[in-house]
């Protein structure tokens, strides 16, 4: 599992990016966020996640809020 902070997340479009210290930003789609109800992330929020290879490069999977 990796950890990082949400750089930005657009709730209307359902995606954003997570900052990884010492690494590249990682794309995150709302479908990767674990939990019930409306799936969104807040800027600056700390999260844990796995990195998987998506259609357009690395993206976050199994995202949990810390």
UniProtKB/Swiss-Prot annotation:
Q: Which domain of life is it from?
A: Bacteria
Q: Kindly state a single biological-process term from the GO annotations of this entry.
A: regulation of gene expression
Give the record's subunit note.
Answer: Homodimer.
Name of this chain's protein: Cold shock-like protein CspD
**Which cellular component, as a GO term, is one annotated location?**
cytoplasm
Its annotated compartments are: Cytoplasm
Show the SMART domains listed in the entry.
Answer: CSP
What keywords sit in the KW lines? Activator, Cytoplasm, DNA-binding, Transcription, Transcription regulation
Instruction: State the species of origin.
Output: Bacillus cereus (strain ATCC 14579 / DSM 31 / CCUG 7414 / JCM 2152 / NBRC 15305 / NCIMB 9373 / NCTC 2599 / NRRL B-3711)
Q: Which GO terms describe its molecular function?
A: DNA binding; nucleic acid binding
Q: State a single Pfam family of this protein.
A: CSD
Its predominant location is cytoplasm
InterPro entries, per the entry: Cold_shock_CspA, Cold_shock_domain, CSD, CSD_CS, CSP_DNA-bd, NA-bd_OB-fold
Every CSD domain range: 4-63
Per UniProt, what is the name of the gene that codes for the protein in this document? cspD
């Amino acid at each position: 599992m990796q950890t990082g902070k949400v750089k930005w997340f657009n709730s209307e479009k359902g995606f954003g990016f997570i900052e990884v210290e010492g690494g590249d930003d990682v794309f995150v789609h709302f479908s990767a966020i674990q939990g019930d109800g409306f799936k969104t992330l807040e800027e600056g929020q700390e999260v844990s996640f796995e990195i998987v290879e998506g259609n357009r490069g690395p993206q976050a999977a199994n995202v949990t809020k810390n």
